[in-house]
Amino acid sequence: MLRAASSIRAVANRGLATAAVARPGVPLDEREGKEIYTTVGIDYNEPKFDKILIANRGEIACRVIKTARAMGIKTVAVHSDVDSNSLHVKMADEAVCVGEAPTAKSYLRADRILQAVEDTGAQAVHPGYGFLSENTKFAAELEKAGAKFIGPNSKAILDMGDKIHSKKIATAARVSMIPGYDGEIADEDMCVKVSRDIGYPVMIKASAGGGGKGMRVAWNDKQAREGYRLSKQEAASSFGDDRMLVEKFIDNPRHIEMQVLCDKHGNALWLNERECSIQRRNQKVIEEAPSSFVPPEMRRKMGEQAVQLAKAVGYDSAGTVEFLVDSQRNFYFLEMNTRLQVEHPITECITGIDIVQQMLRVSYGHPLPITQEQVPLNGWAFESRVYAEDPYKGFGLPSVGRLSRYVEPKHVDGVRCDSGIREGSEISIYYDPLICKLVTHGDNREQALNRMQEALDNYVIRGVTHNIPLLRDIVQEKRFRTGDITTKYLPEVYPEGFQGTSLSPKEQDVVIAFASALNARKLARANQFLNQNKQRSTHVASFSKTYKFVSSLPVKEGERPTEHAVEVEFVEGSANKAQVRIGGKTVTISGDLNLSHPVNSIEVDGEHITTQIVGKRAGEITVLYKGTPFKVKVLPEQAVKYLQYMKEKAKVDLSTVVLSPMPGAIKNVNVKPGDMVSEGQELVVMEAMKMQNSLHAGKTGRVKAVNVKVGATVDEGEVLVELE
C-alpha cells in the first residue's frame, strides 16, 4: 500500500468509560442521553470489532461514534486540515488528518483513508453517507486490505449504485418501475433527443448520484441542455462519476422510501416507510415516519418489494429503497441508496432499532436479532434538517460563518439532536451546511409535530443565517398539519418564495406588547441604577410609572409599518408582569422579560408563548416569534416626531449587476467585457457546498466588466459581472 502523508493523534482514555460500566441489555439511550433510540439493547458478551474508522465528518461521524462508544468499540476519526477542531475529531479516540479542505483532496482520497486504516490498526470502516459510502472500488480495496466495510458488499453497491444498471435489476425483481431510457446519455444533443422521445417533463440525473445532487428537471430543450451540463459537472464534483441518465418526471408525486436491514445469513427486514416529500432542489427538508398517506396493506407491498430487490442483489447491510408515489397510491422504484440514510433517526424512533448498531453487528458477521413479525411501529417521528441557509433565497441558499451562540433544545420531551457542531464551530464553504438533524418522537403525529414546534422555538442559533424560520412555518401550516403534501409542497404553499410567517392582528399585538414591555423594563432598570443612592421608594417607583412609546411592526417586506401608541404599566411594581395598551386594546404579559436571555418563556393573556431576542439596538428590538425574526421599533413619542425629517434611502437598481448570492467558488464565466447579453442569459456558474448555481442577467445589455475568473473564491454580495 502506498504511504500517504498523515498525522495521527491519540486521545487517551476516551470512549470506553461509558461502556465499561454499561449493563448487558440496557438500552443505549439510558447512557447516551436522548441521542440514540433502541429497545434491543447490547449483548456485551457478543464478539465485536475492537476499533473502527469513520470515513466521514460532521454529524454522521458523531452519530456513529456514539453507538460504537456505547458498544465498547474504539473509534478513529479522519479530518481535513480545516476540520482539525471539529466535534467528531474531539469525540473519537484517535484522529488522522487526510488532506486539505476540498473534499477531493481529503475525504474523497480513498488512498489516504486506506493508509489511515493501516496506520491505526482499525479493523473496519464505517463510511457514513456521501463521500465514499457508495464507492465500489473503495469497498473492494478495503476487503483486499483485510478490513471490513461497514456497509453492503461491493457487488451490491455496484449493482445498485449505478442507476442505469439498478433499473434493470429492479425490473427483473418485479419492482414497479418509472418509464425512462435505460442507457447512458453521452452528450447534450442525446439528452435532448431522449427527452423528446420520453416526453417532457423529464428528470436528468447522475447515474452515481444521490442526496439531491446532480439532478435537474427539464421541461423543454433549453432546460435539457442546461440541466445536462450542470448536473454532469455537479456529479463529477460530488461523486467522481459524471454518467447521466434520463427518465420520465412524475409531476407532483410523493417521495416515500422503505428502510431495509439485511445480514450475511440471508435474512432481510423492512423497517417501515419514511415520508420525504418536503424538498427543495431535490433535497429533503422535513421527513416523517411513518407516512400518513400509506395504509397497512400498501406498507406491506412496498416493504416486500424493497426486500425482493435487496435479496436480488445479495444485500447485507442497511439500505433504503426509494419510491415515487402518485395520487392514486401507485408506487414506482426510484433508486436504492446502499448506505445509511440521513433520515435514519426517525426509523429508529418508531422501531426501537439502532440501525448503526445493527450495521456494526452485521458487518462483523452476526445475524439480525429479530424477525419481520417482531418489527414494531411505535408512535410517530419527525426530522427537521436545520441548515446554515437563507430560507428567503430560493428556500435556502447556503450561508457561512461561526456559531457565536448555540444551544440545542434537548430539554424538550421527545427530542433528539444529531449534530456535529458546537458553539464556536465554523460553517465553511467546503462542506454541506447541515447544522443538526432535529428529531421529535411522540405517541401520535400531532404530539410529535407539537414537540417539533416547541423544539424549533427553543433552538438558539446565532452567528449564521439558518432555515428555522421556514421549518417553523411549515410545521404550523394547515396542509402540512393534515398530511396533504407532495414534492411540489414548497412552490405551491410559497409560490413567491418563503417570505416569513404572516402574523394575524392578534399575533402582531403579541410581538408589539413583548417588545414594548422589554423596553419598558430596560428603562425601569436604568432608572433604578441612576437613582440607586436615593431612597428605596424611588426603586419601587421605577416599576410603578407608565412608560409611553410609539411602536411599529412591518408585516410585509417593503410595506410601511403602522405606528401604534403604546403604554406599558407594570402590575403591582413587578418587573415580570405588565399591562400593555396598544391603541384601544389591553394585553397582559408576564414571564421572562429579560433582554439578556436567549429564550424568553412568556404568557400573553394566559397563553404560553416562546420567543427569542435575536437583535437589539437603540429604538429597535428584533423578536423571533414562530421562527421568523420581526424588527419592532419602540421609540419615545418625542423621538418619533423627529423621524419625519429623516430622508429614506433610495433603492439601488441591481439589474445592472450580477451579485454572488452566497460564498462559493467560480466554476464557469461565460461572458467577457463588450459582449451583448439578453435578460435571463447564464453569465456565471458558481459552486458552494457541492451545489452548482447558475447566475443570469437581470436585463438585456452590454457587459461592462467581469470581475472574477474561474477558480476564484467569492463572498456573498460580491459584484461578479457589471452591465452598462
UniProtKB/Swiss-Prot annotation:
Pfam families: Biotin_carb_C (PF02785), Biotin_carb_N (PF00289), Biotin_lipoyl (PF00364), CPSase_L_D2 (PF02786), PCC_BT (PF18140)
EC numbers on record: 6.4.1.3
Gene Ontology biological-process entries: lipid catabolic process
Sequence ranges assigned to domain Biotin carboxylation in this UniProt record: 48-495
N6-biotinyllysine: residues bearing it: K690
Subcellular location field: Mitochondrion matrix
Cofactor note text: Binds 2 magnesium or manganese ions per subunit.
Residues that hold Mg(2+) 2 according to the record: E335, N337
Gene Ontology CC: mitochondrial matrix; mitochondrion
PROSITE patterns: ATP_GRASP, BC, BIOTIN, BIOTINYL_LIPOYL, CPSASE_1, CPSASE_2
InterPro entries, per database record: ATP-grasp, ATP_grasp_subdomain_1, BC-like_N, Biotin_BS, Biotin_carboxylase_complex, Biotin_carboxylation_dom, Biotin_COase_C, Biotin_lipoyl
Stored SMART domains: Biotin_carb_C
Annotated biotin binding sites: F395
Residues noted as binding Mn(2+) 1 in the record, renumbered to the chain: E322, E335
Span of domain ATP-grasp: 167-364
Primary enzyme class: ligase
Major subcellular location class: mitochondrion
Pathway participation: Metabolic intermediate metabolism; propanoyl-CoA degradation; succinyl-CoA from propanoyl-CoA: step 1/3
Record's comment describing the protein's domains: Consists of an N-terminal biotin carboxylation/carboxylase (BC) domain that catalyzes the transient carboxylation of the biotin covalently attached to the C-terminal biotinyl-binding/biotin carboxyl carrier (BCC) domain.
Stated name of the protein: Propionyl-CoA carboxylase alpha chain, mitochondrial
Organism: Caenorhabditis elegans
Highest classification ranks of the organism: Eukaryota, Metazoa, Ecdysozoa, Nematoda, Chromadorea
Recorded name of the encoding gene: pcca-1
